């Protein structure tokens, strides 16, 4: 049995979508643009709490060790690189090819292709990881189980926490005397950048749109949403306090966070689809404009934003 076929599919498992044209290991290198610099390691969170299928038959202590091993992270990172190749850089099916049926979501994640891509990446590394098919089989018996863990790895809380940390650090660095208009513009620029410049954000969007009823996708998205809302609630109250903005009694800071988060999500999706953030006739980014429009409805004294903090 070859590396392509061994354990590729657990009996009865089906994945939605259509076939895709995959990139070869010899093609141009694609670096995943994360919220940290390319080439740096992913956050060293405890993957044993996230990956439910890796080394599933091993003893708990052994499973934890395998889940957090450099090789396990490497297999998952390579899988994300291949998904970037197939889903984000894909140009669509070849309509002149009778055998090209389009893109299947996880069709390109064969063991052989993972190893081939790992070897291609290792050629650029000072310390090659030397991944093998045997290492893969020690971790995942079926491709479907690897795919489940890859989804969990992509959506895991540590990545959201890292993004929130990036935005939080940017907010802390804003001068205390910064005018309200400039504060809003700078915060919007950072919020848009941490997603639009992030290949993993694009992959997460593809996965949750393609698999909206997947239990683990739903679980991770709910946790991600709640974490963002909790952060925005605290941040907006603190920033509004700089200018003495008084919230209308019928609203809470949680409401403000819900509204602005929904606006930001829509603006990011639109920008991702069109290639740039939408601008209003005033020249403002659409998210900046929406925030300014909402101020009179949310605050008793919106004129306070025109005063220096």
Predicted regions and their residues:
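An amphipathic alpha-helix adjacent to DNA-recognition modules
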Residues: 76-77, 137-168
């Amino acid at each position: 049995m070859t590396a392509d076929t061994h354990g590729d599919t657990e009996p009865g498992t089906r994945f939605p979508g259509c076939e895709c044209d995959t990139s070869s290991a010899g093609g141009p290198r694609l670096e995943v643009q994360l919220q940290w610099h390319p080439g740096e390691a992913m956050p060293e969170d405890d993957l044993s709490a996230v990956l439910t299928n890796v080394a599933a038959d091993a003893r708990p202590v052994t499973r934890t060790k395998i889940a957090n091993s450099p090789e396990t992270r490497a297999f998952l990172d390579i899988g994300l690189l291949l998904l970037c190749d197939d889903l984000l850089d894909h140009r669509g099916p070849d309509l002149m090819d009778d055998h090209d049926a389009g893109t299947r979501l996880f069709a390109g994640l064969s063991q052989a292709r993972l190893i081939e891509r790992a070897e291609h990446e290792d050629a650029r590394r000072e310390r090659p990881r030397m991944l093998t098919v045997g290492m893969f089989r020690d971790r995942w018996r079926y491709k479907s189980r690897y795919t489940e863990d890859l989804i969990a790895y992509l959506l895991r809380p540590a990545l959201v926490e890292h993004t929130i940390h990036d935005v939080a650090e940017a907010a802390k660095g804003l001068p205390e005397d910064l005018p309200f208009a400039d504060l809003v513009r700078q915060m919007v620029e950072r919020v848009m950048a941490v997603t639009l410049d992030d290949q993993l954000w694009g992959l997460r969007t593809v996965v949750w749109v393609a698999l909206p009823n997947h239990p683990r996708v739903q679980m991770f998205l709910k946790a991600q949403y709640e974490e963002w809302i909790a952060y925005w609630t605290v941040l907006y109250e603190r920033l509004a306090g700089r200018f003495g903005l008084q919230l209308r009694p019928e609203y809470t800071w949680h409401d403000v966070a819900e509204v602005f988060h929904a606006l930001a999500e829509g603006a990011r999706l639109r920008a991702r689809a069109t290639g740039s953030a939408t601008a209003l006739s005033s020249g403002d980014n659409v998210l900046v404009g929406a925030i300014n429009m909402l101020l009179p409805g949310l605050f008793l004294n919106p004129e306070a934003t025109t005063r220096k903090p």
